[in-house]
């Protein structure tokens, strides 16, 4: 059997990490089995769907490296196909028109709640006579179209993640609405469950891979596949992504969309890697840092967990830091440029080679790309504010003297690491202090703090940027004070 899977997001918001994780699993399964990965945009919710959300979804999937083989297909362009399926169900007696008003349905629900019963439609219009239908139409009532569900029916399937799943027809809430309310004799806008099934039949989807929150929909959809005379695909219901409290990750948890992660400085390789680990366990001997292409050679549902997957920021941060370390200096500079630009840093004033040296220096300490703004600030600033630990160091005996020696020996030409090492040795000897005093005093003067990246490399970069001399002069003045 040819594997054909799909991802079918609704453009009612930006690409959510849960939808993106589902896309990753679908993509991996398709690539593992040399199948097709199809993109479908379920945009029939006209009130909430927005073109900017569609753009965000497409851009997000591309950013993650999830290339699709067919699509994107848009449900709003396929309404005639859905209405034809609804008509087929009406003609075969498997669907009917229901004229209940919203007030009548709400009264039904209220009475059920009063009896501590789960709200459900009681199928009261399932077998209307032509005369009854005519009477409702004469009142000007519009009708939804409902699909008949036998309460005694057992719906079962072997799920690729959850093994055997069984639902009773009586647990599905009564006959299901498959088309919105419309005037007599017409078919209103088809609804989610009907449209999804028609699309999956038309696109010959072999495996439906989605979150476990769709299990109840699957039971309803299996009945629709059968009623339309189509083969039922295989299903895999993946675990939900949970927050640290064990509840489903939602917008209330803050960062949930792929564009949010992108703006925070996470790289697509890290996000895709981490999403694969959200519910899937690598094969024995496989490192947790892997590419999508590597995962696609071994991915299957035998290693997908049933239990919900808790979102672990520490794991994501570690993966992101590893991906950053894998980048070449030129690649990293290109990735960092948008974050420098957003922070108002004019990198055009600095040579490309200097920026690459800076990225090489700071890259190993970055967890996200946004970290570069704070960590690189002292290299772009025209002056620095001395922190308390730096002020204390500059007050140490010998600090002023060794800085004076370094300042006087500074070359007018480019400073190299070898020259910098020699200058330090000469300065501490001339000032009569230990090398540790010289190094700590130089750090305080150049960086304004006793913490920071490699001192000598930082010195070389600051000298090249024309900042070493004025900082030494300012530190000497502070030490005098």
UniProtKB/Swiss-Prot annotation:
The UniProt note on the cofactor reads as follows:
Binds 1 zinc ion per subunit.
Q: What class of enzyme is it?
A: ligase
Recall the GO molecular function terms of this protein's record: ATP binding; glutamate-tRNA ligase activity; tRNA binding; zinc ion binding
Its function, per the record, reads:
Catalyzes the attachment of glutamate to tRNA(Glu) in a two-step reaction: glutamate is first activated by ATP to form Glu-AMP and then transferred to the acceptor end of tRNA(Glu).
Reaction(s) catalyzed by this protein?
A: tRNA(Glu) + L-glutamate + ATP = L-glutamyl-tRNA(Glu) + AMP + diphosphate
Q: What is this protein called?
A: Glutamate--tRNA ligase
Positions binding ATP in this chain are 251
Q: Where is this motif: 'KMSKS' region?
A: 248-252
Q: Where is this motif: 'HIGH' region?
A: 9-19
Keywords, comma-separated and alphabetical? Aminoacyl-tRNA synthetase, ATP-binding, Cytoplasm, Ligase, Metal-binding, Nucleotide-binding, Protein biosynthesis, Zinc
Q: Which family does it belong to?
A: Belongs to the class-I aminoacyl-tRNA synthetase family. Glutamate--tRNA ligase type 1 subfamily.
Q: Spell out the subcellular localization from the entry.
A: Cytoplasm
Listed under GO biological process in this entry are:
glutamyl-tRNA aminoacylation
Its chief place of residence is cytoplasm
What high-level taxonomic lineage is stated for the organism? Bacteria, Bacillati, Cyanobacteriota, Cyanophyceae, Synechococcales
Name any one Pfam family assigned in the record: Anticodon_2
Q: Which gene encodes it?
A: gltX
Q: How does it assemble?
A: Monomer.
Q: Which residues form the signal peptide?
A: none
Q: What is its EC number?
A: 6.1.1.17
Give the residues the record marks as binding Zn(2+). Answer: 98, 100, 125, 127
Cofactor dependency: Zn(2+)
Do you know which InterPro entries this protein is assigned to?
A: aa-tRNA-synth_I_cd-bd, aa-tRNA-synth_I_codon-bd_sub2, aa-tRNA-synth_I_CS, aa_tRNA-synth_I_cd-bd_sf, Glu-tRNA-ligase_bac/mito, Glu-tRNA-synth_I_codon-bd_sub1, Glu/Gln-tRNA-synth, Glu/Gln-tRNA-synth_Ib_cat-dom
Specify the species.
Synechococcus elongatus (strain ATCC 33912 / PCC 7942 / FACHB-805)
This protein's GO cellular component annotations are: cytosol
